Regions:
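Secondary-structure transition motif
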Residues: 1-140
Length: 140
């Protein structure tokens, strides 16, 4: 049976600062998901049924586990990867009802996730590292 899991971010990357003024990374939580009506949803999980933890996350940061693992860990929607053929983003494609690889460097057609090479690695994600695929940096 395929493992069903999601991840979501409890705060925006770099938005909250600590006492010294340093930016903090966004905190990722993993588990099941309850879709909220607005900007927020709930990620829940725990080791035991009696110990279920609930975390409010930004809905637009939720990504599903693809069922694929690489040497750097589990692969989720929104991950940015690197392979011998370039830099890619893991996306859900509605037309094909499948997780796919959208290449940015160099630009190319979408490839099915199953075509991911064994030497591929995850180097970031669209929320924490948009600059890896040409996205803007948020200095706030």
């Amino acid at each position: 049976m395929r493992e069903i899991m999601f991840r979501g971010q409890t705060r925006r990357h770099g938005k909250k600062v600590n006492m010294r003024g340093d930016k903090l990374p966004g905190r990722w939580v993993y588990g099941g998901v309850l879709q909220g009506p607005g900007d927020f949803s709930i990620i829940y999980g725990g080791e035991n049924l009696g110990d279920i933890e609930k975390h409010t996350v930004y809905t637009d940061t939720i990504g599903q586990y693809t069922g694929r693992d690489v040497k750097t860990g589990k692969v989720f929607e929104g991950d940015i990867g690197k392979s011998r053929d370039g830099i890619f983003l893991v996306v859900w494609n509605e037309n094909n009802s499948a997780h796919m690889l959208q290449f940015y460097d160099p630009p190319a057609e979408l490839l099915y996730l199953e075509e991911m090479w064994d030497d591929s690695e995850i180097i970031g994600n669209i929320h924490d590292n948009p600059e890896l695929i040409g996205g803007g940096q948020d200095d706030a």
